Structure formats: structure tokens, C-alpha cells
Amino acid sequence: MDLITEAGIDQVRLAGIAQRAHMSTGQVMYYFTSKEHILLETLAWQEHQDTEARRATLAKITGVWRQLDRFIGHYLPVSPTDPVWILWMEAWARAPHSAEVSQFMEALLRPWRDDLAAIVARGVEEGAFVPPDAIDDFTLRFVALLDGLALQRLRQLHQLSRKRVIELAMNAARAELAPGSQDTER
């Protein structure tokens, strides 16, 4: 992962990957068909690790607003050089050119939307959230908002701190989910 996040997958040589993995280039090519394959499998491995950690953390938090805040904190980049987000950016750049990459990425994003949907459903059930018209639409829209905030952060605009992007995301969530935040006539 370090090589990819340091220079980008297009700048990394297979020999460099093999050297870091203590393998030959032939061995790397035996397991991976291309550098893109290495990128996607690295991202999938990291997302699997992060999903387990996120779900364990969220399970320990009481209160749906606190869970949502923590979810947002897990989603957004820690810094403008967040290695996982760099992997996502590398993969996103390939998605418009490959339906296979797009489907692969959709499968990686699904657990995020599922976790968000579970928080929203729990919040509605507890009366802490106003029910959105459709939870799936809300999760798609909210994850898109988080992606946009993440991109702003990754552009290395230092005036846009992590605390500020989390605050902006929570404000958007409150605007849609907080009781009294919406008209009663839909």
C-alpha cells in the first residue's frame, strides 16, 4: 500500500512492488494480472479491515447521533495524505473506463451505505431521526456528500480542517434527519 500511496499506481514499477513484498516480479504477476489488480485488491483488503474496525467501534457507541458522528469520522480522510483515500482516488480514476472496476468499487462501498442505513433506521425507530422518504436515497445522497467533502479535504486546502468537514457533514445530516428540521407537509 505504501508504494501506491507514495507515488500513485501509474508510477510504481512491478519490480518495486516485488521488492517490497520480498517476491520476484514473476511471483507478483502470478497472483496479480496487472498493477490495477494490485491496486484494487489492496483497496479491498484495506476496506475489509476498516469495515471490521468500524463496525466494532460503532457497536460500542450509544446514541444514534454519536454513532453517526463516529461513522462520518471513519468515512472522511484523516489528512490530505490519507493512504486509504489515495487508494480510492486511484481506483475512482479507473472506474469511468471499466465497468468491472465500477462494479468492484460498488461492492466496496455497499458496506458503508449498509452501516449508514442501519444507523438511520435505528434513529428513526428510536424517534431521534425524522424518517427520510427513502433510506436508500438518503444513504446514496449522504455518501455522495461525504465524498465531495473528502475531495475538498484531499485537495490539501489546509483551511478546511478535518473537524470542519465533520461539522459540515453533521450539519447536513441534522438538516435532513433532526426532528423539526423538515416541513411536516412533504
Segments (PLM) and residue ranges:
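Short coil/turn segments at alpha/beta junctions that flank glycine-rich nucleotide-binding fingerprints
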Residues: 6-10, 61, 126
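Helix-turn-helix
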Residues: 2-37, 41
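Amphipathic alpha-helical segments used for helix-helix packing
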Residues: 67, 80-103
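Short alpha-helical functional segments enriched in proximate histidine and acidic residues
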Residues: 3, 49, 78, 115, ...
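Hydrophobic alpha-helical connector segments
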Residues: 41, 52-85, 135-142, 166
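Hydrophobic/aromatic-rich alpha-helical bundle segments in the mid-to-C-terminal region
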Residues: 102-106, 110, 124-173, 180-186
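Residues in soluble alpha-helical coiled-coils and helical-bundle/repeat scaffolds
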Residues: 33-37, 41, 59-63, 79-80, ...
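Short, basic, alpha-helical segments at the C-terminal edge of helix-turn-helix-like DNA-binding modules
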Residues: 44-50
